[in-house]
Amino acid sequence: MWLAPGGVRQQGEGGQTRLKFWSFLFACCSLNLFPSSPLPLSANGLATVYHALAAQNVSPAPAPALRVDPKAQVLFDQVIQTLGGQAFLGFKTLTTRGRSFSITDEQTTGFVTFESQVEYPDKRRFAYGLGKKKPIVLINNGDQAWEVDRMGLTHQTPEQARRWKITNAYSLENLLRLRTREPGTLIQDAGSDFIQNLATRVLDISLANRVDVKLYLNKANPLPVRITYRVQDPKTLEWDEYADIYGDYQSFQGIQTPMHITRFFNDERISETFRSTAKYDEVFPASLFQPPEQ
């Protein structure tokens, strides 16, 4: 026998259920969990609710499981092994050098040489320029984004930072090593198609964040040929179409690395990157992904 909120004595299983409900309700009210509160719940608040639920033997809903149909699983495993197996899954950094072209209306509008240093999943330093001039440096570190040029330090524009976060999230490396392993992801065999005059197999990847990705694989290898995905613009609410074409794979440190990458935005080719060198697992100082001291 025990006292429920309000001093009402309860007995038996039904009374225990009512006690759990009122205890949970009280915890929610104490933490302002209802829609009348304009502020999001803090991490401490979430932890408190979790412990309150645990104390009442009420388990939070489990995260949705990763789902892969059997045909897709076989194909996905082949992709990982072809790219390098554990060497591909385990590398932490990638340094590349080469040339990059910007394209507008199918005409080349710019050309630079570059050095790119990436620490996965979300840090990069990209230095580009021409000749002996001091290069422009783009630095991204999670949600932070800076640009360093001959005039000094500034922040990247919000749109510039947003675009990089999107394309980085669904890059070959992050898609296959992170996104496809997130809870709630569904991977299905989507049949065959022709891309870049190549016969391909297609995997349809539906992510928990409601982004749909298509991964096109060369039937002969099977190396990734193309990745396409749609992301909604938060301002216009229009759906933007992104596509990356991967080619000229070469092996570096046991990892098959695409040396030619072409990017499309809403069906328009906007850039081509030709890598000349690639090196994995260089150790970078933390300061590499921070703005220089002024």
Model regions and ranges:
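Intrinsically disordered, glycine-rich low-complexity segments
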Residues: 4-16
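Bacterial N-terminal signal peptides
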Residues: 23-36
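Signal peptide processing junction and immediate N-terminal pro/mature segment
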Residues: 33-60
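N-terminal mature ectodomain segment of secretory-pathway/periplasmic proteins
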Residues: 60, 66-153, 183-191
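Gly/Pro-enriched, hydrophobic low-complexity segments
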Residues: 131, 192, 196-293
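Acidic/charged, solvent-exposed loop-and-adjacent secondary-structure segments enriched in E/D, K/R, S/T
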Residues: 146-176
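Short, conserved active-site entrance elements at the starts or edges of catalytic domains
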Residues: 166-202, 224-228
